[in-house]
Amino acid sequence: YVTDFPDDELIQKNGVIPIPHLGASTPEAEENCATMAVNQLREFLEHGNLINAVNFADCYLPPTASKRILIANKNIPAIIGNITKILADRKINIANMLNKSKGDYAYNIIDIDNDAEESAITQIRSTKDILMVRII
């Protein structure tokens, strides 16, 4: 028997598994969950960071440059090399980069030192297996 509210008598019995009460249905918990969701959405919109996403790995990189490229792609070999080559060919320096994958998908946060030329972004977007590109 599993319970999150064991009393003294119940907790003494064999087969009882007491677990912590999470309070997920209390008004306080609902408010905290809403606040957490808003903060996570704001973090994605403002910085491109993914926190507690369902279909992507958590991906958090504090901003280290004035420009940021966000890329979602299929998790396959050589795609990162293709992306970085496009940037290198245009002399766009990568200041910091994070790549995380979960199953069939990967997400990249790339901080760059200079502006990304539109032609570079267009070429990245048109690369096979790239799902999304966003500039912040």
Regions found by a protein language model. Give the residues of each.
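Rossmann-like dinucleotide-binding domain for NAD(H)/NADP(H)
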Residues: 1-63, 107, 136
